[in-house]
Swiss-Prot record:
This is Dioxygenase olcK. It comes from Penicillium canescens. Its cofactor is Fe cation. Pathway: Secondary metabolite biosynthesis; terpenoid biosynthesis. Belongs to the PhyH family.
């Protein structure tokens, strides 16, 4: 096997938000990851940061439950803060309606599965002095990983938005480009095979759940903060439930955002309605109100 020197490893490819969807999808398929520049505007970055600051100040670092796999992957100086639908109006109004996020999710999931929804959204904050996270694949959290073959469709994608600069010295996410295509399920990468996903605030790294990755060591004096949004086919149970979101908040969301958090009936790729109430569509049976004309934060990808 040929060993590639770390200084000769290719960087993650980057495109503008206005790049054609087919170009984005091609890079995602070939490399397992693609950086989209200016995924959200800096004004939105600032609003999200201000909305989550008080919650993060109260949030403890380290694993927030006793799962063994989380003990191994969440460092003692890293905060994972969920509940963003209630904590951040900007998240539920703007990010959950992001046209590029939906265009990519549609491209990945629609033909094989039908509708998709949110698996989990969380702010990940890596503090100064945090060690590098162990390399992992997000889809290894789920039992169905054992039944996948090299020809299986992708089952989850992560849209990781930089809320601060991502630099190698402050713990930028490290990627093993191409590892989503490895046929040997026992193969595990070394740190020397990783490259940092360096980004400006507002950029996003989009990567497949089958790609090896992990947060880098934060050698700087500042925290590194990002917003992770994973989507997957609605056939799968999300990691985070939104059953406790007050109806007053739900009814001030768009139909698309409502469906993303499990408050609407979804359909399979054959048009079969799922997640129904009293044999009817959830939104009809609950007489659910919604905002029908969302403010789009960017033009949809072509």
């Amino acid at each position: 096997m040929t060993i590639v020197s770390p200084d000769k490893l290719p960087s993650a490819r980057a495109v503008e938000l206005t790049a054609p969807l087919d170009d984005i999808y091609q890079i995602l398929n070939e490399d397992g990851a693609v950086i989209i520049k200016n995924f959200i505007p800096l004004e939105l970055v600032d609003k999200i940061n201000k909305e989550v600051d008080p919650y993060l100040a109260q949030h403890a670092a380290g694993p927030n439950h006793m799962s063994e796999i989380y003990k191994l992957t969440v460092g003692s100086k890293t905060k994972h803060m969920g509940n963003l639908t209630m904590a951040s109006k900007s998240f539920r109004d703007e990010v959950l309606n992001h046209p590029s996020m939906h265009a990519i999710s549609e491209k990945l999931f629609r033909a094989n599965f039908g509708d998709y929804w949110l698996n989990r959204a969380a702010v990940l904050e890596v503090d100064s002095g945090e060690k590098a996270q162990g390399l992992h694949r997000d889809d290894s959290l789920y039992p169905w990983k054992a039944f996948l073959t090299k020809d299986s469709p992708e089952l989850m994608v992560n849209f990781f938005i930089a809320l601060t600069e991502f630099r190698e010295e402050n713990g930028a996410t490290r990627l093993v480009l191409g590892s989503h295509k490895w046929e040997d399920s026992t193969r595990y990468p070394s740190p020397e095979q990783t490259i940092p996903a360096e980004m400006q605030a507002g950029d996003a790294i989009v990567y497949l759940a089958s790609l090896f990755h992990g947060a880098g060591q934060n050698r700087s004096q500042k925290t590194r903060r990002g917003l992770s949004i994973t989507t997957h086919p609605a056939h799968f149970t999300p990691m985070e439930s939104h059953i406790d979101v007050p109806r007053a908040i739900i009814e001030n969301m768009t139909p698309l955002a409502q469906k993303m958090i499990g408050w609407r009936t979804w359909s399979t790729n054959h048009g079969v309605p799922v997640w129904t109430v009293r044999d009817g569509r959830m939104e009809d049976e609950l007489k659910l109100k919604s905002l029908e004309s969302p403010k789009q934060i960017q033009a949809a990808v072509i």
